[in-house]
Amino acid sequence: MLGIGAFKQRMPRSGEALPGRTQALPLHNTHLINGHPLRGEFTGLAQVQFGLGCFWGAERKFWNVPGVYTTAVGYAGGKTPNATYSEVCSGQTGHTEAVLVVYDAQAVSFEQLLRTFWESHDPTQGMQQGNDVGTQYRSAIYCSTQAQYDAAIASRDAYQQQLTAAGYGDITTEILYPAPTFYYAEDDHQQYLAKHPNGYCGLGGTGVSCPIGLDA
């Protein structure tokens, strides 16, 4: 039998993923910072999912961006439906810790969000982010439209040039369209650093500026 550590650097294969559950985890559907719903139809607004390491600090990066309507943290990109945090930490779900960003495209461009994403973490680290090691910390952009996907790919290629010039390796960010199912995380993880101001935040960027979104 494989130990939990076996799944820290690789995705679970067929038959290895935890079964999960059909029922969604309980959720208090109000954003602690802005009072907007965490879950809904969001008619007239755009959505994207970002994975950039521990989602506690990652969510704060985006709720502070003007034009963002709401944010929520959850699990995406894996195999286990409605996984719990402890299950995701085992590495046996295949999920990454993700932030759902719902935004008004008339108030903030997707390119501006991409710039925040790239500059807020090191996207060259594979299945880890800093001292946080595991598949749940991999870098990811899960797109809801083809236009988002095209922009994400273009931004990756542009940022790769800057990173290469600064001595970094290849970007390992997983970019997908259509976006996989987003499973909301437990209540305590939502807006975690607002509830726990001295809570852990292991995010750290490369210090390399992203050349997109500068004039948006």
UniProtKB/Swiss-Prot annotation:
Its EC number is 1.8.4.11. It catalyses: L-methionyl-[protein] + [thioredoxin]-disulfide + H2O = L-methionyl-(S)-S-oxide-[protein] + [thioredoxin]-dithiol; [thioredoxin]-disulfide + L-methionine + H2O = L-methionine (S)-S-oxide + [thioredoxin]-dithiol. It comes from the Bacteria. Keywords: Oxidoreductase. GO terms for molecular function: L-methionine-(S)-S-oxide reductase activity; peptide-methionine (S)-S-oxide reductase activity. InterPro entries: Met_Sox_Rdtase_MsrA_dom, Met_Sox_Rdtase_MsrA_sf, MsrA_MetSO_reductase. GO terms for cellular component: cytoplasm. One of its GO terms (biological process) is protein modification process. Has an important function as a repair enzyme for proteins that have been inactivated by oxidation. Catalyzes the reversible oxidation-reduction of methionine sulfoxide in proteins to methionine. Belongs to the MsrA Met sulfoxide reductase family. This is Peptide methionine sulfoxide reductase MsrA.
